């Protein structure tokens, strides 16, 4: 028996959030690092791969003895949930059991009704070169506080592995 478990939720931005898009070319005076946006609506969005990668990184920091440069060296429970490109003893690559969908904004009307016209803001920052003490100003676009994004995660459960399923769901829930 094989089944899929759907995990749904809402991610609320508590402070300005930047998940960057391409900044291959920036005109003078333009934002140096724009936010990734939904091509249909031009609203900020969160790629599922970004959340999945962040989840894996945080869990790897918690469960690995040392931070691994290569994700194939993660502990077995993380590789079982998120996959590994390393072949096992049978020559099989371990596929991810988790699918994280792209997250789109779900409260645009609520934000507009509060009199807020834009869903992003531009934050001016400085990075200072430690050796020369020269400031390098830059502009970062961020999704504003209060935006909400729908989360949809699918976990692929395999029959006969009930103990693993419980452990995997607990791991994802962290």
Language-model segments: residues:
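RNA-binding basic/glycine-rich loop and surface signature characteristic of RAMP-family CRISPR effectors
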Residues: 1-128, 132-174
């Amino acid at each position: 028996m094989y089944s899929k478990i759907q995990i749904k939720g809402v991610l609320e931005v508590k402070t300005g959030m930047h998940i960057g898009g391409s900044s291959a070319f920036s005109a003078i005076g333009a934002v140096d690092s724009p936010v990734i946006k939904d091509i249909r609506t031009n609203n900020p969005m969160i790629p599922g791969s970004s959340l999945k990668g962040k989840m894996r990184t945080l869990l790897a920091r918690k469960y690995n003895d040392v931070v691994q440069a290569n994700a194939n060296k993660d502990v077995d429970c993380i590789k079982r949930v998120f996959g590994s490109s390393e072949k096992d003893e049978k020559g099989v690559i371990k596929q991810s059991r988790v699918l994280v969908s792209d997250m789109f904004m779900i409260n645009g009307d609520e934000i507009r009704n509060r009199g807020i016209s834009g869903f992003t803001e531009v934050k001016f920052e400085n990075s200072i070169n430690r050796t020369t003490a020269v400031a390098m100003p830059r502009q970062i676009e961020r999704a504003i506080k209060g935006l909400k994004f729908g989360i949809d995660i699918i976990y692929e459960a395999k029959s006969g592995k009930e103990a693993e399923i419980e452990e995997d769901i607990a791991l994802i829930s962290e």
